[in-house]
Amino acid sequence: MRYLVFQLTLHGMKQRRRHFPRLKLITLVILLSAIIAWVAWSFWPSSARQMKRSVAIFTCQSWYEMVCKGKTILYVSDIATDTALVRPSLQQDSCVRTTYSTGVWVNSCFFIPSCRGRMVTVMTKPNEINRQDAWTLIEKEKERNQKRIRQLRDQLKELNYYLRINNVHDEGYNTVAAYAYEKEAEKAHCIRLAQLFDTVRKTDRPQLIRKAVYTAYYRLPNGECQQARMREVGSSKQCQTVLLQTVGRTTPTGVAPLSVFFVNGKSHGAALAVGYGGLGVKELASSDASCSIIPTTLHDNRHDLPAVLGGDGSPVFSKRGYFIGITKGNEVITRSQLRGLLRKEKQP
């Protein structure tokens, strides 16, 4: 009996030794297949359809809030280069400034699908305003507002004089009356601002805080337009690029994220760009724009793509479909610069 058990055990060991090389071979084949699939996925060029699905329209709705004693007392659309407050108002809706650019969905790691709603685009971020600078801006705006009130009063004197001496209510009279009404409303607005500025003291330590809402507009495979709220997770002041991510940290359905390889692509010759018509022109920009593939030519990482066909952030591909970079002005931001941006991602 013991001899029989011994023989059966010995036979089982021989069978396992015989199957062990076969198991190693199967494992090796599976591993090699996975590596080949990974290499093919990583380095396979984008098709025309994938190029179009890699982009979205990015909008930034921004404004400034003047905060005094923890309360918002004034809204400002922007701060001009001459430090003038642009369109100060007591209502937020009249101060929202919308800018457009092209956004590109990207993977954080080039060798695996790792988008999770990440997007790169071009956007100039203004410098933060400290309390001292905020008070200086308020003082200058207070002076400008008083000057504007004096100008409006002088204009209204002339307009009201014209209306008094002309009793015939013809078309010219009605036009002047409507213009005078607009100027009267503008003067009333400036007076309200003056009253507000008079209540602000330097000891109140007023602040000017920039607010922004980011949204990405993309299309499903059936052409239906969708939108996703975005948040900033990184930026490069030198390249004027921004890394964003969907609020839910998920990749939208139907998009085709691009992989940013660790070496730069071609910088000369014929290339292709994906652009939204009119997005690079302020008067034509719209979230309803459609993208198209446009031929362009590169020379030392510069392109000849007209702004009316593709604005900042438009992705550039080689003729074979390999991602090269994104546009900023007439330059192309390279893959290495974009990888530097990806490394600056802030952890939540």
Task: Enumerate the predicted regions with their spans.
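Conserved active-site neighborhood of the chymotrypsin/trypsin-like protease fold
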Residues: 111-130, 178-268
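PDZ/PDZ-like groove recognition
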Residues: 347-348
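N-terminal Sec-pathway targeting helices
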Residues: 11-32
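N-terminal intrinsically disordered, acidic low-complexity segments at the extreme N-terminus
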Residues: 1-13
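Membrane-interface motif at the C-terminal end of an N-terminal transmembrane signal
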Residues: 35-47
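Flexible, gly/ser-rich surface segments that form the specificity/activation loops bordering the active-site cleft
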Residues: 43, 92, 98, 221-225, ...
